[in-house]
Amino acid sequence: MRTQWPSPAKLNLFLYITGQRADGYHTLQTLFQFLDYGDTISIELRDDGDIRLLTPVEGVEHEDNLIVRAARLLMKTAAASGRLLAGSGANISIDKRLPMGGGLGGGSSNAATVLVALNNLWQCGLSMDELAELGLTLGADVPVFVRGHAAFAEGVGEILTPVDPPEKWYLVAHPGVSIPTPVIFKDPELPRNTPKRSIETLLKCEFSNDCEVIARKRFREVDAVLSWLLEYAPSRLTGTGACVFAEFDTESEARQVLEQAPEWLNGFVAKGVNLSPLHRAML
């Protein structure tokens, strides 16, 4: 039997770089919120212990794909602790709507959905804390998708405090370029010493993203989309880009602006939600 599992997008409603560790990783403060929009992962169980991704991603080797890595990591961890039935495997396919290199967390969300779904389907019984710990080894953004609640994140993104920001409507636009995260984080002009503030203080301030100035400088497409969106509503970069978003109080306001978008702009309208669609589907 095939089951389907949501793999939602996220937005960074704000993102501030507060320092850089000796190992090169940047410390940050950011606010994650999910969207009721994303990829869909389909899983069909196998009884031969194999993991097969039926929808490979162009340019990504099978074993390097985060979906496959997440499945194998859970399999190895559960088997080592005697929590995996012999022969447990899966055929996995994905209906991909989220762009790669877009700052919407697509790959991290895919990995988290696979961890949560296979833990359920294989009846491994790993706790949410255990799954989040596994997720962190796959990527800094994976734990927030595993836990499934909007969160204020610190450290390199792994220290999470659940929060409930307003659930607004967003017009999310993709400029048609992919921005590798290292391109932003290695730029010498990236702000790296934004003062740390409490979540209470940050929620009262105007939101911004320290990566935005670099993305706009290096990618004229990002600058063009943001310049257009800012004529209509508060708008900013999510993550390290390339996607940008404008916020609205109602769906109709967001759709009216999308209808006026120039032909070169690709976008969609979605609602911000504090409970992940993945976790809502499991209630």
Swiss-Prot record:
InterPro entries cross-referenced by the UniProt entry:
GHMP_kinase_C_dom, GHMP_kinase_C_sf, GHMP_kinase_N_dom, IspE, Ribosomal_Su5_D2-typ_SF, Ribsml_uS5_D2-typ_fold_subgr
Tell me the GO molecular function terms. 4-(cytidine 5'-diphospho)-2-C-methyl-D-erythritol kinase activity; ATP binding
Q: Which domain of life is it from?
A: Bacteria
Question: Active site annotated at which positions?
Answer: K10, D141
Write the Enzyme Commission number(s) for this entry. 2.7.1.148
* GO biological process, any: terpenoid biosynthetic process
Keyword Amino-acid biosynthesis belongs to the record? no
Q: Which reaction does it catalyse?
A: 4-CDP-2-C-methyl-D-erythritol + ATP = 4-CDP-2-C-methyl-D-erythritol 2-phosphate + ADP + H(+)
The reply to whether Magnesium figures as a keyword in the UniProt entry is no
Q: Which UniProt keywords apply?
A: ATP-binding, Isoprene biosynthesis, Kinase, Nucleotide-binding, Transferase
Q: Which residues bind ATP?
A: P99, M100, G101, G102, G103, L104, G105, G106, G107, S108, S109
Pathway(s) where this gene product acts: Isoprenoid biosynthesis; isopentenyl diphosphate biosynthesis via DXP pathway; isopentenyl diphosphate from 1-deoxy-D-xylulose 5-phosphate: step 3/6
Give the similarity note: Belongs to the GHMP kinase family. IspE subfamily.
This protein's assembly is summarised as: Homodimer.
Q: What the protein does? A: Catalyzes the phosphorylation of the position 2 hydroxy group of 4-diphosphocytidyl-2C-methyl-D-erythritol.
Identification of the protein by name: 4-diphosphocytidyl-2-C-methyl-D-erythritol kinase
Q: Which organism is it from?
A: Escherichia fergusonii (strain ATCC 35469 / DSM 13698 / CCUG 18766 / IAM 14443 / JCM 21226 / LMG 7866 / NBRC 102419 / NCTC 12128 / CDC 0568-73)
Which gene produces this protein?
ispE
